[in-house]
């Protein structure tokens, strides 16, 4: 129970370039995992960011896959066992939304990073929808306060309107841009003064808002403005209540500058104190409580070649209940066979270390020799199937062909491993037998091509295919389904699970099929 209580497993999510990876790095700095944070600036890497470990990420300065990192952390002034923090740093780039959606099934809470100048952006909106669907509590960090941006109240209004959630500031900025003096920590009633480019220490002052000491620290004008702002904050926004945050009704808001390491420690200190410990997980059969004695877990991500020196696959397993023990036999539910793991690992981005045990909330890396698929369940014998790992209907489609006949084996292996990772979806057209890759954005095609060449020594060629939508289909009457598949043979494909997929080449074809075959159900995600 004690081990469960001290765990905090969360994702950091944002629109591209809001400062998500930089914030992750600074958390690791406070957790003692790294000595210097590598800031991503203007899409060029000043020092390589720890959490962006794949070659293509280092080249382009964007995150294209979820990184998993863990560290122990105890806020200043607290005593006892440290909190065990598990961070999942997700891709901000919109092309990799699906990886982020899957990651949100493995966390108990989330921190959303918002650019103070740009406010709520398209990707922020989408990610918040997924958090709302799963009732995931969120904290919002308004970043880049050291740059000229929008009025803090305007940003808060936009957050409430666009993200459809009530907010409650727990810190408040004093000026911004060139006039940025620091933040007042409402939660701790403490003044934090801003000094640019400090790696670790900021000046903290215990000060009463109504005292003259405040004027001496920030200036009379700024102090008067802060008092006025705080009066408005306390009048407009409800008093903070931890339970309304944990039930995803209210989002606490912090202000700061991740690049300058400002406001980050206050965010982390408050987060570990108020964020939920591991929550129950819904399986198809029943609700699984973390306190249960028997181990259960599910695979939410697979990554090939996490170590370029050893061509290896790692399956990321979220522990849901009980205790995971190295070398213990567990049931692989889908395969119906017993498996053991002699070298389970935990992560600091690309650095990993072997562990002997893990508890609910932990993310464990399991060596994968091809036995895992995303969504697989491990138990001590019980037949359980965890929910909530859908594939979404892709937006873009291309035929993929092997462009180096002598490298056919490498091409097949690379395509299979990338497909198992969930980088993109792969369909086999039943009419002509050709493989079709479906993605949510153009960048995914580039990533597949790059990784096939650099990790598998294989080459691929893309050819255009005109498709509008991929739908998973089902019917209560098997004969009706067979009849549809015969009538629409040229549009039929199979996905990697062998499920029937209807590939419509236009909106008209799709709507006519739905109209003419009313007993067929068309689904736009694979989970139905």
Question: What does each model-identified segment do?
Answer:
Residues 1-528:
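Structural and coupling elements of P-loop NTPases
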């Amino acid at each position: 129970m004690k081990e469960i209580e001290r765990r905090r497993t969360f994702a950091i999510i944002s629109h591209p370039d809001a400062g998500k990876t930089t914030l992750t790095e600074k958390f690791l700095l406070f957790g003692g995992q790294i000595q210097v944070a590598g800031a991503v600036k203007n899409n060029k890497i000043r020092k390589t960011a720890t959490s962006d470990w794949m070659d293509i990420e280092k080249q382009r300065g964007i995150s294209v896959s979820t990184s998993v990192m863990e560290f122990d952390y105890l806020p200043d002034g607290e005593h006892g066992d440290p909190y065990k923090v598990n961070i999942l740093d997700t891709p901000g780039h919109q092309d990799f939304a699906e990886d982020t959606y899957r990651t949100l099934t493995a966390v108990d809470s989330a921190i959303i990073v918002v650019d103070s100048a740009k406010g709520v952006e398209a990707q922020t909106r989408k990610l918040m929808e997924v958090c709302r669907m799963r009732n995931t509590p969120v904290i919002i960090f308004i970043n880049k306060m050291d740059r000229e941006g929008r009025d803090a109240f305007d940003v808060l209004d936009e957050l409430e309107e666009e993200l459809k959630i009530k907010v409650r500031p727990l810190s408040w900025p004093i000026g911004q841009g060139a006039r940025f003096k620091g933040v007042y920590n409402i939660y701790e009633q403490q003044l934090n003064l801003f000094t640019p480019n400090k790696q670790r220490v900021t000046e903290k002052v215990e000060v009463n808002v109504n005292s003259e000491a405040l004027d001496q620290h920030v200036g009379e004008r700024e102090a008067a403005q802060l008092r006025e702002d705080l009066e408005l904050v306390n009048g407009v926004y409800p008093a903070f209540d931890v339970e309304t945050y944990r039930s995803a009704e209210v989002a606490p808001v912090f202000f700061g500058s991740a690049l300058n390491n400002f406001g980050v420690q206050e965010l982390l200190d408050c987060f570990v104190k108020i964020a939920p410990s591991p929550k129950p997980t819904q399986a198809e059969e029943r609700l699984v409580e973390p306190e249960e004695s028997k181990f259960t877990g599910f695979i939410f991500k697979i990554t090939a070649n996490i170590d370029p020196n050893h061509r290896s696959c790692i399956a990321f397993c979220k522990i849901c209940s009980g205790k995971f023990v190295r070398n213990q036999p567990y049931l692989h539910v889908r395969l119906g066979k017993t498996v053991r793991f002699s070298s389970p690992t935990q992560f600091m981005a690309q650095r990993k270390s072997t562990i002997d045990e893990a508890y609910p909330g932990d993310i464990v890396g399991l060596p994968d020799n091809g036995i895992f698929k995303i969504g697989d369940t491990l138990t001590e014998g019980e037949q359980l199937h965890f929910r909530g790992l859908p594939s979404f209907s892709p937006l873009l489609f291309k035929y993929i062909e092997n462009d180096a006949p002598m490298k056919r084996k490498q091409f097949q292996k690379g395509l299979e491993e990338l497909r198992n990772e969930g980088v993109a979806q792969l369909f086999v057209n039943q009419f002509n037998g050709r493989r079709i890759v479906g993605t949510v954005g153009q960048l995914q095609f580039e990533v597949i091509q790059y990784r096939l060449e650099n990790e598998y020594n294989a080459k691929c060629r893309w050819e255009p295919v005109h498709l509008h939508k991929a739908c998973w289909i089902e019917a209560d009457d098997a004969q009706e389904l067979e009849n549809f598949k015969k009538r629409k043979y040229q549009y039929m494909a199979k996905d990697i699970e062998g499920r029937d997929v209807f590939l419509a080449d236009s909106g008209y074809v799709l709507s006519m099929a739905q109209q003419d075959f009313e007993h067929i159900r068309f689904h736009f995600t694979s989970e139905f």
